[in-house]
């Protein structure tokens, strides 16, 4: 048995825990701390702005030792982000180093050198390795127990499968994959390997407990519709492909960044935060935000296998020689859209429509809000029954029956608590996943429980890409009314990038 297999077995057995009494003193921690030999060694893959923002959560977890970082970019100070210095302030606060990268204000850092520096600064040593290619990382550091994947969406699936096939536990940002068939394979690989997995959106999901109680006691009659709307996208959704070819930045491996996707010239409009808007690289606003709001809804109502997915989307017009014409666009998500999913009845639940809105779209104001002289917020969720409605925040927080008079006799749930951001927050999901890595039960955010939401966000993308109402055969994973759409359910992998190759 290999050394890394021995170590993982040791972490997952009570016999291994008992063996601490004979370890050399240099491997023992101070009183009350977890010994280094019992920590989960983890590689953090993806050190762009989102990856760096998430890294402090791992560093603050006592069960975890970050030993390596990986990213195709060595270093850059010109990343794109949600604000100019917000990331820098967050990192300084997390590291308790107000002077970290002093003089770099007004720039946005990123890359594996920055990630390594964060890890080494936090631990007070120089023990973190850094790689451009995750495959080299896996080859050279076989004793790594787990990985966290914070790359652009198109790389999630292949990296997750490569890690799980090597017996490594995995935590990943949303989505699991940005192709339906690839997401299915990721979930099946998690099932067949038995490693501990955690899908990060679980940590931000709201509770369906109160909403379910009102549905079950008949407060809104039979549930018919669920409406969920977001103010995303808050990044550019480019309506045309880049035509210029700027040079690849020094220290950036464009080929590695492309990963499984087909070759094309480098352009900065594909990378950083704007990857979300491209069908090849991202998953659109529903993949970005719908996992946070809807996963708990899918789980509670057992939603999967929609029979129909119907898109309504904005379009682009251009003038060419004085004549207006539409832009044919099957490469980027629209600026605004509404997508309706029709889910069949299941068990005691009747058929339900789920309607997703983005880009400023939302349902019309219902009479119940007119009665209260109120209007919808920019983001929210509404459950519509044949006898009433429940309005909640975007992530199902603070649900209430509308109009207000209907709350009489229905105590409102406590307001959702907001965690302070002064220190890194250790989500219950991270702790539960760490316990699963050591042989405990899978976390409630396990990949095995994400099939329904992964199916929906990938079908949403296919419907928008084809601009067609699609009829879907869930059992056979097939679009039945528009054969051309089926090619978008899976990915055509570049040579050397198929799940079998990595």
Regions from the PLM with identified roles:
Residues 2-168, 184-196:
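N-terminal glycine-/serine-/threonine-rich beta1-alpha1-beta2 phosphate-ribose binding loop
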Residues 11, 55, 70, 116, ...:
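Non-transmembrane alpha-helical segments in soluble domains
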Residues 12-35, 332, 435-502:
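C-terminal helix-rich "cap/oligomerization" subdomain common to oxidoreductases
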Residues 44, 172, 197-199, 392:
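Hydrophobic residues in well-ordered beta-strands that form the structural core
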Residues 47, 250-435, 441, 455-461, ...:
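Glycine-rich, aromatic-lined ligand/substrate-binding cores of catalytic
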Residues 50-54, 76-79, 140, 235-237, ...:
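Short, solvent-exposed loop/turn elements at domain surfaces
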Residues 73-76, 131, 150-156, 176-178, ...:
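Short, solvent-exposed turn/loop segments enriched in Gly/Ser/Thr/Pro and often Arg
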Residues 169, 177-251:
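A contiguous active-site-proximal alpha/beta segment in oxidoreductase catalytic domains
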């Amino acid at each position: 048995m290999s050394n890394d297999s021995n170590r993982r077995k040791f972490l997952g057995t009570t016999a291994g825990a008992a063996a601490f009494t004979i370890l050399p003193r240099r491997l023992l921690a101070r009183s009350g701390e977890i010994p280094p030999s019992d920590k989960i060694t983890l590689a953090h893959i993806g050190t762009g702005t989102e990856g760096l923002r998430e890294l402090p959560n791992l560093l603050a977890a006592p069960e975890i030792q970050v030993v390596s970082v990986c990213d195709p970019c060595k270093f850059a100070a010109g990343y794109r982000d949600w604000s100019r210095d917000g990331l820098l302030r967050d990192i300084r606060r997390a590291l308790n180093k107000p002077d970290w990268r002093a003089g770099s204000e007004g720039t946005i850092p990123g890359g594996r050198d920055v990630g390594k520096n964060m890890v080494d600064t936090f631990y007070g040593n120089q023990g973190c390795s850094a790689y451009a290619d995750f495959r080299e990382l896996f080859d050279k550091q076989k004793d790594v127990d787990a990985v966290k994947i914070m790359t652009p969406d198109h790389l999630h699936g292949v990296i997750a499968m490569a890690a799980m096939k090597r017996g490594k536990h995995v935590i990943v940002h949303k989505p699991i994959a940005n192709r339906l068939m690839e997401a299915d394979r990721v979930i099946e690989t998690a099932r067949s390997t038995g490693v501990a997995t955690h899908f990060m959106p679980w940590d931000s999901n709201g509770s369906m407990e109160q909403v379910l109680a009102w549905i079950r006691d008949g407060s809104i009659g039979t549930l018919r519709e669920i409406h969920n709307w977001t103010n995303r996208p808050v990044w550019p959704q480019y309506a045309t492909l880049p035509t210029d070819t700027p040079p690849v930045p020094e220290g950036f491996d464009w080929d590695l960044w492309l990963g499984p996707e087909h070759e094309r010239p480098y352009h900065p409009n594909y990378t950083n935060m704007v990857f979300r808007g491209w069908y090849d690289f991202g998953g659109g606003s529903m993949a970005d935000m719908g996992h946070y709001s809807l996963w708990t809804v899918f789980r509670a109502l057992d939603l999967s296998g929609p029979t129909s997915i119907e898109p309504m989307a904005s379009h682009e017009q251009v003038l060419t020689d004085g004549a207006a014409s539409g832009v044919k666009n099957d490469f980027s998500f629209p600026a605004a859209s509404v997508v309706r999913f029709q889910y069949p009845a299941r068990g005691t639940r009747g058929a339900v429509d789920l309607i997703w809105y983005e880009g400023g779209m939302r349902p019309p104001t219902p009479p119940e809000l007119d009665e209260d002289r109120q209007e919808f917020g920019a983001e929210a969720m509404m459950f519509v029954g044949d006898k009433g409605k429940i309005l909640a925040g975007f992530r199902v927080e603070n649900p209430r029956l509308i109009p207000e008079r209907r709350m009489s006799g229905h105590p409102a749930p406590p307001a959702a608590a907001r965690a302070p951001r002064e220190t890194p927050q250790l989500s219950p999901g991270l702790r539960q996943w760490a316990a699963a890595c050591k042989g405990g039960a899978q976390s409630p955010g396990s990949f095995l429980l994400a099939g329904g939401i992964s199916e929906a966000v990938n079908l949403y993308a296919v419907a928008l890409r084809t601009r067609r109402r699609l009829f879907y055969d869930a059992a056979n994973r097939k679009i039945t009314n528009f054969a051309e759409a089926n090619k978008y359910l899976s990915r055509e992998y570049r040579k050397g990038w198929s799940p079998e190759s990595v």
